[in-house]
């Protein structure tokens, strides 16, 4: 009886107050969609302004966008390899930009101060559903990369360099998305909570240094996520000898 009560209580635990959208029998976290649309819309406007008038001598936003392009290209080339990195640049770039914008949106925008009829807004990456979805997308991508480049030979990876590695390699397929999702979720949620508490207690000066620290850690987390995604894809397409 006690165990059932405890399990029910733990199952009911939630981080923050959610804005729910009911579609048939499916209940969605509406705040994730709202903040994602706002941030992605802002990103599209930013990119549109930066590419509106392309010049041979880039300045301003165009210069920043070209820097990001070169950075993502070098990241993909280093982690995935010269042979197929171009095929995966759009995916790695999209992952990096989405996570980066989501993280920075959580650090810069006081979402929780925006009043809703129910629930509260927050960074998309501060919701475990978002980070798990991103991590599963990465897992599907490196499976696809391995199978599309090697065919059935991809499964040789699981017994390389010895068949003893098979259970460990299978276990690794489960730990990769778990570590990706919980690392990102934990860091961004912790940053949001710390800033939120400080804004409530000392609303003027003290939260500012913490916000700058949050911007730094948010950028690092986006870089780590994109780098690991590229590394896993590179590992899947790598030829084992």
UniProtKB/Swiss-Prot annotation:
Membrane topology field: Multi-pass membrane protein
Keyword Glycosyltransferase: no
Taxonomic superkingdom: Bacteria
Pfam families per record: ATP-synt_A
Subcellular location field: Cellular thylakoid membrane
InterPro entries, per database record: ATP_syn_F0_a_bact/chloroplast, ATP_synth_F0_asu, ATP_synth_F0_asu_AS, F0_ATP_A_sf
GO CC annotation, single: plasma membrane-derived thylakoid membrane
Keyword Chloroplast: no
UniProt entry keywords in alphabetical sequence: ATP synthesis, CF(0), Hydrogen ion transport, Ion transport, Membrane, Thylakoid, Transmembrane, Transmembrane helix, Transport
Any one Gene Ontology molecular-function term assigned to this protein's record: proton-transporting ATP synthase activity, rotational mechanism
Transmembrane segments: 30-50, 91-111, 128-148, 193-213, 214-234
Protein's job: Key component of the proton channel; it plays a direct role in the translocation of protons across the membrane.
Quaternary structure note: F-type ATPases have 2 components, CF(1) - the catalytic core - and CF(0) - the membrane proton channel. CF(1) has five subunits: alpha(3), beta(3), gamma(1), delta(1), epsilon(1). CF(0) has four main subunits: a, b, b' and c.
NCBIfam families, per the entry: ATP_synt_6_or_A
Protein family per UniProt: Belongs to the ATPase A chain family.
Protein name as annotated: ATP synthase subunit a
Gene: atpB
